[in-house]
Amino acid sequence: MDPRAPNLQLNAAFAALSDASRREMIRMLLQKPRRAGELAECIDMSPQALSRHLRVLRKAGLVSEQGIEEDARVRVYSVHPAAFQPVQQWMAQVEELWRRQLHSFKAYAENPRRLGRHRP
């Protein structure tokens, strides 16, 4: 496996999620799988624009597409949860960094010597 793969996945996910319309699509697809037409109606977007956004989400691996047996032309989209794992891991690292920083700041702020309350 290419050692750059996790960073490439993370970059693709963040690039895909950088657009508010795509985040709204993800929010809707987290509720339930939907057809492209449903998404277009709910988001008030042209089919062409929706198709471009869905392509970005699919390329990032965040959304998957499936046909239905009744009509091969109809595509149903759903969230691919495993693709969010690199984002979740990165966010956990950032959260831990901030937790440590805040802990250090608290220790500094509560230090009696710094506050002039130190007795020899």
Regions found by a protein language model. Give the residues of each.
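C-terminal regulatory/oligomerization modules of transcriptional regulators
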Residues: 1-9, 28-47, 59-64, 81-120
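Short, Lys/Arg-rich nucleic-acid/phosphate-binding segment
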Residues: 67-76
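Alpha-helical DNA-recognition elements
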Residues: 56
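Residues within the DNA-recognition helix of helix-turn-helix
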Residues: 53
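Short helix-coil-helix linker/hinge
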Residues: 16-21
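Pre-recognition alpha-helix immediately N-terminal to the DNA-recognition helix
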Residues: 23-25
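Interfacial catalytic loop of ABC nucleotide-binding domains
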Residues: 12
